[in-house]
Amino acid sequence: MSNQMTDSTSAGSGTEHSVDTNTALKAGSPNDLKVSHEEDLNDLEKTAEETLQQKPAKEYIFVSLCCVMVAFGGFVFGWDTGTISGFVNQTDFLRRFGQEKADGSHYLSNVRTGLIVSIFNIGCAVGGIVLSNIGDRWGRRIGLITVIIIYVIGIIIQIASVDKWYQYFIGRIISGLGVGGITVLSPMLISETAPKHLRGTLVSCYQLMITFGIFLGYCTNYGTKNYSNSVQWRVPLGLCFAWAIFMVLGMMFVPESARFLVETDQIEEARKSLAKTNKVSIDDPVVKYELLKIQSSIELEKAAGNASWGELITGKPSMFRRTLMGIMIQSLQQLTGDNYFFYYGTTIFQSVGMDDSFETSIVLGIVNFASTFFALYTVDHFGRRNCLLYGCVGMVACYVVYASVGVTRLWPDGPDHPDISSKGAGNCMIVFACFYIFCFATTWAPIAYVVISESYPLRVKGKAMAIASASNWIWGFLIGFFTPFITSAIHFYYGYVFMGCMVFAFFYVYFFVPETKGLTLEEVNEMYSEGVLPWKSSSWVPSSRRGAEYDVDALQHDDKPWYKAML
């Protein structure tokens, strides 16, 4: 990046003065950075920190509610996941979009099932890359409203489908485009709005809403399964209009991202946004300090010119590593195998002899939703790295039991092996499926979004998050499409495949994912600039908070062999 930048004039002030070397470094700026402000940055930082420490918890209610409203975008995604798993087993849906057997009953072939379930993910991948640009151009709020409208268009096409499966298929692609944009813009707006000490928890609310949507989707399927007509699936789809209207209305009360406003030179609006989210006046030291930090960071990024897609590979500091990390984390989140249960949970538990597999899916949904509340605590108390690592260990253990019981005691081709089939074994598998979902919901489910939302500088954030999210959707498509074929071929041995992925994920997180707990987005950038080793990153301290004896070199090198460094 360039070591020079132009003078910046702060709104509401006609004076300029230079910031000394230490102050410039604190702001993440080059030494000759000039800013417009009445107070020295050192004094502002001290005053702002004192103000924040004295703020009662109730002062964060408004910004928390705003972030929860934005996180409701996750509910839209979860609702689709929870309902589609039931649709593919409902009689009216099978009659309209399936194929007829010789006995007059209807079924969905593996190909058609895979396409209907998984094509949504392809739409999401494209929407995440293409439609998320609306947020960079017109703002995060306008971007979210736009993609919600696209989502509704897709829902209308699905509801209007009568007996042509490809019409329903097209509707799922279009609704996927909208949800793909939501999955990028929602965590992005939350991470840019939330106070740093609450950011992990509030970004995790996005995953909480996903689990809430999955749970209510399961419940709605259970409530409509006894109907014999299109009420079975059209009512759950029709409820999507209510969710869309609720979110659009909510966007009217959510302040725009201050970082976006500063980037588009709307300084006064940024000041108002910061004041609104912090529940203070626009002249408060907290607003002045946060605005100055954002300005200095963005001015530095603008000095290097507009970000290109190629900068995700060639950019500094460590942009290729950070881009690859986002792709890997989002890919591995899918390779945990969660959608194996969520997309096909009803089908799976039919195969193990459960009397009402819809009820079993509701149990999984309850565990998933309840566990995510625990994640709101763990993400900011145990750190991102530790949660991901512990999650890998827990899920590996669950898959060992789940798959081993499945391949030794249960056979999907039950009549061929009636002597070794066991309903008790099926119950055991459900228990460990619940343990697995607890491990997933408290670790990888929310933290994957937290990690990518706070790993990139603003200049490339939209593009980097879009690429990372696209990798998640592509793997979601592959798992959703091929799961019917794989389970038909290897049955419950499939669990060992996901177990192997989690073993790989453990080592990847340990060696390549740094700890970002408690850091501002600008401080994360500074950590990457200093080349801190990921397994030592939890000990890293930003330059603005270091003592005289702080040794950053010790965090950049490790003389121990890798296997000792892990212990």
UniProtKB/Swiss-Prot annotation:
Family statement: Belongs to the major facilitator superfamily. Sugar transporter (TC 2.A.1.1) family.
Positions annotated with a glycan in the UniProt record: 89
Region (Disordered): 1-36
Ranges annotated as spanning the membrane: 63-83, 114-134, 142-162, 168-188, 200-220, 235-255, 335-354, 359-379, 387-407, 430-450, 467-487, 494-514
Name of the gene this protein is made from: RAG1
Polar residues bias spans: 1-24
Intracellular or extracellular location(s): Membrane
GO molecular function: carbohydrate:proton symporter activity; D-glucose transmembrane transporter activity
Cytoplasmic side stretches: 18-62, 135-141, 189-199, 256-334, 380-386, 451-466, 515-567
Mode of membrane association: Multi-pass membrane protein
Entry's Gene Ontology cellular component terms: plasma membrane
Species annotation: Kluyveromyces lactis (strain ATCC 8585 / CBS 2359 / DSM 70799 / NBRC 1267 / NRRL Y-1140 / WM37)
Function: Low-affinity glucose transporter.
One Pfam family named in its UniProt record: Sugar_tr
Keyword vocabulary terms for this entry: Glycoprotein, Membrane, Sugar transport, Transmembrane, Transmembrane helix, Transport
InterPro entries referenced in this protein's UniProt entry, alphabetically: MFS_dom, MFS_sugar_transport-like, MFS_Sugar_Transporters, MFS_trans_sf, Sugar/inositol_transpt, Sugar_transporter_CS
Annotated S-S bridges: none
Main location: membrane
Signal peptide from the UniProt entry: none
Stated name of the protein: Low-affinity glucose transporter
Extracellular face of the membrane: 84-113, 163-167, 221-234, 355-358, 408-429, 488-493
SUPFAM superfamilies, per the entry: MFS general substrate transporter
